[in-house]
Amino acid sequence: MGVKNHSTVTEFLLSGLTEQAELQLPLFCLFLGIYTVTVVGNLSMISIIRLNRQLHTPMYYFLSSLSFLDFCYSSVITPKMLSGFLCRDRSISYSGCMIQLFFFCVCVISECYMLAAMACDRYVAICSPLLYRVIMSPRVCSLLVAAVFSVGFTDAVIHGGCILRLSFCGSNIIKHYFCDIVPLIKLSCSSTYIDELLIFVIGGFNMVATSLTIIISYAFILTSILRIHSKKGRCKAFSTCSSHLTAVLMFYGSLMSMYLKPASSSSLTQEKVSSVFYTTVILMLNPLIYSLRNNEVRNALMKLLRRKISLSPG
């Protein structure tokens, strides 16, 4: 017999980023712009990598996978947030909230492991360049990406199952702009000890495991770079990692400030500011960081644009 959910709440109300009426339209325009840049940037990155044979390498395979993940991630959160800026009705059904929570967990956890996989790829490329194509074969890359999404899916099932067993019999106002674990736990009228423990244990394990992988990879990378005698060679080697390192620092910084603490100790403002960074801003910046600081991507983009112009009539 399945676990019975004693919830009497059939829908939730999202409070949004702010309740000030005069800010709704400016915020709608701002986040619509961010979402547009995110979608166009990530889909463009995927297209550039797919259409240019010179970019069919392990590094760009992971980058296109990250772009796909960021596109899905932003589409889970932003459309509902945008509708909340324009509509007076900010309600979301119980099932809709659980679905959004599930896919959010899949995306945010997968993002951590994708960044760790990309760090491993850079480690092999710089520390074992002669064996790079052998170690990071297409099969290995595909298995790594599949493992990334599998871990995200498994953890989302665990968190989602724990939230489903909670009772919601009081207020149905989620003081957030999307259905996140911490605000939902605060609404529950049943014991949330297990849920808070799982957030800390599983979330802590995911962040420690992935961040340690990244730190160890970059420790070996830095050691290898320092062994390069020429300054030009060191700069070239480090330039292949700088974009990824920037993305890692931004993502993990905002994520750790949100989840690696008891839910009761976080302020509403802090939660929303942290969430805006890792659910919207960073997803927009990722394709810009990787393209603007990568000569191969810039050259491939210019090549595609010149081809489009030459094929256009007139």
From Swiss-Prot:
Keywords of this entry: Cell membrane, Disulfide bond, G-protein coupled receptor, Glycoprotein, Membrane, Olfaction, Receptor, Sensory transduction, Transducer, Transmembrane, Transmembrane helix
Topology feature Extracellular, residues: 1-25, 76-99, 161-197, 259-271
Membrane topology classification: Multi-pass membrane protein
UniProt-listed GO biological process terms: G protein-coupled receptor signaling pathway; sensory perception of smell
Residues bearing carbohydrate: 5
SS bond list: 97-189
Any coiled-coil regions, as ranges: none
Pfam (any one): 7tm_4
Keyword Membrane: yes
CDD domains cross-referenced by the UniProt entry: 7tmA_OR8D-like
GO cellular component: plasma membrane
Cytoplasmic side: 47-54, 121-139, 218-237, 293-314
PROSITE patterns: G_PROTEIN_RECEP_F1_1, G_PROTEIN_RECEP_F1_2
Record flagged with keyword Cell membrane: yes
GO MF terms, alphabetically ordered: G protein-coupled receptor activity; odorant binding; olfactory receptor activity
Protein name, per record: Olfactory receptor 8D4
Species the sequence originates in: Homo sapiens
